[in-house]
From Swiss-Prot:
Source species of the chain: Prochlorococcus marinus (strain MIT 9301)
GO BP annotation list: L-histidine biosynthetic process; methionine biosynthetic process; purine nucleotide biosynthetic process; tetrahydrofolate interconversion
Name by which UniProt lists this protein: Bifunctional protein FolD
InterPro entries found in the cross-reference section: Aminoacid_DH-like_N_sf (IPR046346), NAD(P)-bd_dom_sf (IPR036291), THF_DH/CycHdrlase (IPR000672), THF_DH/CycHdrlase_cat_dom (IPR020630), THF_DH/CycHdrlase_CS (IPR020867), THF_DH/CycHdrlase_NAD-bd_dom (IPR020631)
CDD domains per UniProt: NAD_bind_m-THF_DH_Cyclohyd (cd01080)
Length: 298
């Protein structure tokens, strides 16, 4: 039977440790950690994700500050808000909920976020430090995936790893992080020739293409580990209902793989948990708290 990599279970275990850590250090710091989330427009999925982050913050004792801006706001006004939050000593972490309306310069807004508060790890300073393998904020989804693998003692060093997808949010930073851990990484994308053949070489296959059910059994070798980053809401056979699926056609590959992540309940919860970790890391540095946060992770 294939091993289920249960991100929901692991995330709750880590959250419990984070809650204890904040409780034991809040008296020294004189305040709880603070996370600011900037949401622009009315994208329904963004609303769900922001709500999930707010709930997760509440569970561990982080104070969340939600800024929901109308999409008729100007770029300069958003930049001014970011600059204000950069100076706010009650804010340890800040993120721009993506996607945002196309009229905005997304990367320019992200570049305005102080790198020490950039809990999504998307500021060019943090990306540059990742390339150089220097300590910095790490992107949440890649960090969540690595901790999920570590929780089951799945080694990365020396493994052939194929990443399907090259986004700045997942594919690129994940590939760099795996390289820094001595994995042998191949990054693929929609233009890769013979994609299924390339994927069949993988000991660990990570699907982050953003295409529902792209990966079937023809992409997977016997005994591989498959990580599904995708999440899609599709119409079910009952037209009045929808169902969630990932980039992997799980029922087609499950008999071949050694381990897999479910959708939902796999990578998603760990992404949120690593956001909390990054926020607490920034809080810890500001107040010179001595405990090592890595001790709370797998």
């Amino acid at each position: 039977m294939s091993l289920k990599l249960d991100g929901k279970k692991l995330s709750l275990e880590i959250e419990e440790r984070l809650n204890e850590y904040i409780s034991s250090n809040k008296e020294i710091a004189k305040r709880a950690p603070g996370l600011a989330v900037i949401r622009i427009g009315e994208d329904p999925a963004s609303g769900v994700y922001v709500n999930n982050k707010e709930k997760a913050c509440s569970r561990v004792g982080i104070k969340s500050f939600i800024f929901h801006l109308k999409d008729n706001i100007e770029q300069k006004e958003v930049e001014q808000l970011i600059n204000k939050l950069n100076l706010d000593k009650n804010i340890d972490g800040m993120l721009l909920q993506l996607p945002i309306p196309k009229k905005f310069d997304e990367q320019k807004l992200i570049s305005h976020i102080n790198p020490s508060k950039d809990v999504d790890g998307l500021n060019e300073i943090n990306i540059g430090k990742l390339v150089k393998n220097e300590p910095a904020m790490r992107s949440c989804t890649p960090a969540g995936i690595i901790n999920l693998l570590r929780s089951q003692n799945i080694k990365i060093e020396g493994k052939k790893i194929v990443v399907v997808g090259r986004s700045l949010l997942v594919g690129k930073p994940l590939s760099l992080m795996l390289l820094n851990l001595n994995g042998t990484v191949t990054m693929t994308h929609s233009k890769t020739l013979n994609l299924n053949k390339v994927c069949r070489e993988a000991d660990i296959l990570i699907a982050a293409a953003g295409k529902p059910n792209l990966i079937d059994s023809s992409f997977v070798k016997e005994g591989a580990i498959i990580i599904d980053v995708g999440i899609h809401r599709l119409k079910s056979s009952n037209k009045n209902q929808t169902r969630l699926c990932g980039d992997v056609l799980l029922e087609d590959v499950i008999s071949k793989v050694f381990a897999y992540t479910p959708v939902p309940g796999g990578v998603g919860p760990m992404t949120v948990t690593m956001l909390l970790v990054n926020t607490i890391f920034s809080w810890q540095k500001q107040f010179g708290l001595s405990s090592n946060l890595n001790d709370l992770l797998p």
